[in-house]
Amino acid sequence: MMTSNILSRFLPPNGSPSVYETIRQHDNHSDASDVEERAGMAFEDEHGDRFSDRELEDALADAGRDDSPGPSEPFLPRSPPTKRDEGGFLKAGSRRRKFSRSGRIHAASPRHKFDDSDDDVPPSLLVEGDQDDDDVLRSKLPPPPRSIDPPNVEPPPRPSPRDDRVHWEAARDRLPLHDTNRRAHHASLWSAGYPNLALVDPKEKALWMWANVENLDNFLKEVYTYFLGNGIWSILLNRVLSLLTFAFVVGFSIFLTNCIDYHKVRGSRTLDDILIQKCTKQMSMSATFLLWLLSFFWIGKAFQYLLDIRRLKHMHDFYHYLLGISDAEIQSISWQEVVSRLMTLRDSNPATAGAVSAKHRKFMGSQSKQRMDAHDIANRLMRKENYLIALINKDILDLTLPIPFLRNRQLFSRTLEWNINLCIMDYVFNEQGQVRTLFLKDTHRRALSEGLRRRFMFAGIMNIFVAPFIVVYFMMHYFFRYFNEYKKNPSQIGSRQYTPLAEWKFREFNELWHLFERRVNMSYPFASRYVDQFPKDKMVQFAGFVAFVSGALASVLALASVVDPELFLGFEITHDRTVLFYLGVFGSIWAVAQGLVPEETNVFDPEYALLEVINFTHYFPGHWKGRLHSDDVRKDFAVLYQMKIVIFLEEILSMIFTPFILWFSLPKCSDRLIDFFREFTVHVDGMGYLCSFAVFDFKKGTNVISQGDTGRRDAARQDLRADYFSTKDGKMLASYYGFLDNYGANPRSGHPSTKRQFHPPPTFPTLGSPSAIEMGNFGDRPAAAGLMGQQSTYGAAPRFGPAGMGDHLSPAPSMLLDPHHQPSASGFRSTHRANPYPRYRASRPPPTISDPIEDEDPPAGKGRSAVKSSPGVGSSGGGIGTSDSNLGESWRMNLVGDEVEEEDEGGENVDTLAGGGGVLGLIQQFQKVNQDNRGRTTVGI
């Protein structure tokens, strides 16, 4: 009875089909050529058209009635023989659905003429396929009737389903209505044209493979993986070394645990005295089974790597011959340049066999480009990752530990991340990498949710069996890798890094891994600076005392060993513990304690360091605002930035706690997960189904990111709806700005880039750095510009002018975006950020310390004019302010937008004259300051 109750939790109830069977049937019944169903990625020629049994029955009946040619048949036009080119390929193609369409029309109207060549595409515009397929079919079909059948002729009786099956088999043998082996046919043509692939020009072969790409997502992932691997030889070397590392860890661990007699170590002098002869024969059954299991795994990986060499060679040829990038150059070239060359290759080869279906080839034939610019490539590469970023940002996943004293603590490790991808992503996405359309309908919500719960349960059970082996391997690997490093530099034991959960919180939509890694790595010096200098006076005093005592003892022992090394090094201070042993112990204690004591010359300013971290990580929760100095913020940041040894211990413990999270925590949010994929998935023609947050509307710019229905009367309902359908902490806005920073600049159009450059952290804040009140306590985002906060006037021209403001080489603002993705003039004007912190913009320049103003949203008209009036109005910064008094009221400040509005009433716009910046703009600004303010307000330079 207990066994049946346990199984009933994992098995579906009686009489209801499995959710996997429903998904499989839905995928099989989906029309392969439907853009909405198959996301525009299906290739119709692979699947063929579906003919009903009635149509085939009518065709067979017509063929049986009139097998001999009619009196008028000799006068019918005959189709010419199929022509082939020199390579053995058919010259042109035609659509195969025309026969089924004409068959239906012919059955409904016998007077319909068979010739519908007016709907055909001219042969000169066709790219590939069989040109005369329809002519061949017409030659094999009976001639069309010349008169209407007599009205007294009764239709033949409908046969039984068994007869329908017989007719279907006969029709498939007699009438080649569809070539079911089209891919094999192309392979035979290729083999006939090129009998020996080794003799084919590698460039021609690479072009042929590029033209026959069927799954663009997988192909671009291979391109990106090859780019990250730095070429074929680096990838092969990495794989060989990984296999050798795995073999060494397993072999050395077995040697240490089974081949040494540790009882004989104390009295032995040589290694042979403690070795166990033929130790493998004396191993236990569990150790033997584990060794065989790991050996088979190693052999399987080696065999997989050998088979993958052919694919790597093809990718090498693609990079070398089509993109013009060698293995030596790939290590230093940027991804933006690779994207640019991919777009150039796409333009020179407009059609691929797998990306455009036969049904839409006529429409795509008039288009010179496909959906494959920087935005589309990022969406294809991060189709799944964008969903996971949104899930973590919106706190959909319940990652709390189901333990009474740890219920408020979240656990997210690499092991749990792998299980989430296995349980959720592999469940939602099909084999082609597209979202299953069944998840986009609310009709199967309950069944899909129950299926997801069962996947969590099953994954938890599997983790119980796999966890012991993984724990042992990772512990040995970590010990072998980091012990020598900690031995040489004991202070490294306190080094920190971001946790896996912090990385997913920091990562932005459509941000590839290497770009994210570069951005986060630049924040490490400032993060360490913040953690090290935060108030910890008690610990510093205690560490100083320990360092003093241990250093004194170590120095005395070291001095004695220098005086008489032969006698003193063998001297035992305690039983079997010599001076050399205690010298190592005291030296290690001194190094660790000294690492906890900060430098005496450090200036205490944790808010400044944390603001620098925020400028790189783009993570600034709302409850941190105005509280950067508090201990609560320090604790929140310490959870995201932990010591490496703690992260490793959490990884080991997560293998024990992951089953409990999969059993008790994640099943609670299965309904929300199914609703999330249904409500935050949009369809893009030619791209498929994407996360709605990852589809940037460049034409509207940042205006579209301010989500929420402003037309509703119920404010509470409006706020709830806006919060539900928007991201937290400005994630989408930061992603939009980050994407423009990475891909928006056109190096050939003369637009300067404002991407934040990395500089090592100074030992103390400079005099030009803003105060904590100025940067941390006011504004919606950290305000920083210029050097450390004052907006620099040099180079203050807007990064992007209106469309067409570039030089004559390329008027487009970005070379890596197609015309339909080019931001409009207003969209670019809204992204004028002439400071090195381009992603966070306050609604006003930073106030002075004595200006206790509150955050308020400016009117739409004023905010828009402020953005258009001066490039200096940005996230934060100094800008040009005017004082109403020269003496006691210098704390009052007018916004640049208000000042420009007043000038527009009686004079010309300065921005119009100066063109948004440059020397003329600087002169005009200095003249304005000297005339109106008598030189008291400064221009941040």
From Swiss-Prot:
Biological process annotations from GO: mitophagy; piecemeal microautophagy of the nucleus; protein localization to phagophore assembly site; reticulophagy
User: Where are the Lumenal topological domains?
Assistant: 261-286, 563-577
Q: Which Pfam families match?
A: ATG9
The UniProt record places intramembrane regions at 456-476, 645-665
Quote the biased-composition stretches of kind Basic and acidic residues, using this chain's numbering.
23-54
Transmembrane intervals: 240-260, 287-307, 542-562, 578-598
GO cellular component, alphabetical, reads:
autophagosome; cytoplasmic vesicle membrane; endoplasmic reticulum membrane; Golgi membrane; mitochondrion; phagophore; phagophore assembly site membrane
PTM characteristics: Phosphorylated by atg1. Atg1 phosphorylation is required for preautophagosome elongation.
| Amino acid composition bias (Basic residues), ranges on this chain | 93-104
Q: Which UniProt keywords apply?
A: Autophagy, Cytoplasmic vesicle, Endoplasmic reticulum, Golgi apparatus, Lipid transport, Membrane, Phosphoprotein, Transmembrane, Transmembrane helix, Transport
Query: What topology in the membrane does the UniProt record assign?
Result: Multi-pass membrane protein
> What residue ranges lie in the Cytoplasmic compartment?
1-239, 308-455, 477-541, 599-644, 666-941
GO molecular function: any one?
Answer: phospholipid scramblase activity
**Pro residues bias: start-end ranges:** 71-80, 141-159
Q: What is known of its domains?
A: Forms a homotrimer with a solvated central pore, which is connected laterally to the cytosol through the cavity within each protomer. Acts as a lipid scramblase that uses its central pore to function: the central pore opens laterally to accommodate lipid headgroups, thereby enabling lipid flipping and redistribution of lipids added to the outer leaflet of atg9-containing vesicles, thereby enabling growth into autophagosomes.
Q: What is known about its subunit structure? A: Homotrimer; forms a homotrimer with a central pore that forms a path between the two membrane leaflets.
Q: Which family does it belong to?
A: Belongs to the ATG9 family.
Q: What is this protein called?
A: Autophagy-related protein 9
What is the scientific name of the source organism? Aspergillus niger (strain ATCC MYA-4892 / CBS 513.88 / FGSC A1513)
Mind giving the lineage of the organism this protein is from?
Eukaryota, Fungi, Dikarya, Ascomycota, Pezizomycotina
The gene it comes from is: atg9
